């Protein structure tokens, strides 16, 4: 069984992100990049499916600039067999739908039994690509899954989707799309052997012309990015407890409009 895992390279959560000079994108200078954490759950689950079945192939796929290969190498170090890197200036100003079209085209070429995503990328929190890919392919889709089990015949996958108070259980015919939620598993750390072996594994570079081109322009564009305003300093209320309590209530009601 072949499993494709779509991943995205995002800024490390510990990185101080600044807005670029054009006001429409972040300044990438000095940023540390990582695999989006939710995508790591998807990679881990793909590896577990392969290990449980005793055979198969796990392919990591990502769209982005040259540095995206670092994220793909991380997936190869975890245990993915090979990777596909979608890299073309035609996708530089793309939105989620353009990304979904490109990924769907690769998925059609690869013809996997299962396509896994993280529930959302932590840089934009859009969470749209998995569902868009499923719609473009005409495949069933389950989002935010907390458990999964592929049947022995490789014909269906049973997934548990988190809802308030429990799990919704679905049986999806394969091929299908699913997006991973935190709690699905605990992603493994790459071993030294895995890190060294990743250097020898294939990363296939794909251009827009290889999959039919980026024929439709992005439907969504960023107008402006703004930094959050500085947080106002706290206020210490002095005095006797009774008077301080009255002042606190007044401040919450009249100044903060909190009560």
Question: Can you say where each PLM-predicted feature lies in the sequence?
Answer:
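N-terminal glycine-rich FAD/FM-binding segment characteristic of electron-transfer flavoproteins
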Residues: 1-259
